[in-house]
Design a protein with these regions (language model features):
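Glycine-rich phosphate-binding active-site loops on the catalytic face of alpha/beta enzymes
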Residues: 93-106, 136-146, 181-204
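Active-site phosphate/pyrophosphate- and oxyanion-stabilizing loops and adjacent acidic/basic residues
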Residues: 61, 150-153, 175, 210
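A contiguous pocket-lining binding segment that forms or flanks enzyme active sites
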Residues: 127, 131-138, 147-149, 155-161
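Catalytic beta/alpha-barrel core
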Residues: 23-25, 45-53, 70-78, 83, ...
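Conserved N-terminal beta1-alpha1 strand-loop-helix module at the mouth
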Residues: 1-90, 109, 179, 199-222
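Catalytic cores of alpha/beta
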Residues: 35, 79-89, 122-130, 153, ...
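Glycine-rich beta-strand-to-loop/alpha-helix junction loops that act as flexible
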Residues: 74-75, 164-169, 186-189
Length: 223
């Protein structure tokens, strides 16, 4: 395995400590800072802004500017152009639902930590050959859940792969994913779903963030 493209130790430590990644779909740029503030108030330190809407790049840039203490992640990064957008917006890292070699290589060349999406052993091995050690496990819940992740991760334990399980993971399931040693952090849209953002229900988002933080803290104390 190539090690040149491994995530920096400081970033890995931040991901593990934070534990929860709020996966966001932001339609209105005016909501960007408000939702980030609500998450931070509740104890969630990582905001993944999915690059699915016209306002995504600007929203990510605003979060980076107004809440520099947060860890900004660009999500659903599918093309080299979106890699450039993520970097220009200030993203600390990027993730994707799948693995596009051209996009991954561009991120590596530009120095942006990038976790491609994988589900099967074949996809994991392709990511390994391309120098990846931190992988997004997607779609986690519908793709077999934690039992499947444990099974596909087992043959690669000696490579110290780390996973970011994401995709329909419920609040109740989050604890078990975090307890798995190969899990670095868990992504969840339940913390700040699109409907709550559109409805500007910042208090409810903060309450959900607090619950996520409580789950992370409980697991980290046990570990």
């Amino acid at each position: 395995m190539e090690n040149a493209h491994a995530f920096p130790p400081a970033l890995c430590k931040r991901l593990v400590g934070a534990g929860a990644i709020a996966v966001l779909v932001i339609d209105n740029v005016d909501h960007a800072v408000r939702v980030a503030e609500a998450l931070w108030k509740g104890g969630v330190e990582i905001a993944e802004v999915t690059m699915r809407t016209p306002s995504a790049a600007e929203s990510l840039a605003l979060i980076c500017k107004e809440l520099p203490e947060m860890l900004p992640v660009a999500g659903t990064v599918l093309t080299p152009a979106q890699v450039d957008d993520a970097i220009d917006s200030g993203a600390a890292m990027a993730v994707a639902p799948g693995l596009q070699q051209e996009t991954l290589r561009h991120a590596q060349q530009r120095g942006l930590p990038f976790a491609p999406g994988v589900l099967t052993p074949t996809e994991i091995e392709k990511a390994i050959t391309l120098g990846c050690q931190t992988l997004k496990f997607f779609p986690a819940a519908t793709g077999g859940g934690l039992p499947f992740l444990k099974s596909v991760a087992a043959p690669y334990q000696h490579l110290d792969l780390k996973f970011l399980p994401t995709g329909s993971i419920s609040e109740d399931a989050m604890e078990n994913y975090l307890a798995f040693p190969a899990t670095m952090a868990v992504g969840g849209s339940w913390i700040a779903p699109r409907a709550l953002i559109q409805g500007e229900d910042w208090e409810e988002i903060t309450r959900r963030a607090q619950r996520a933080r409580k789950i992370v803290d409980a697991i980290r104390r046990e570990g």
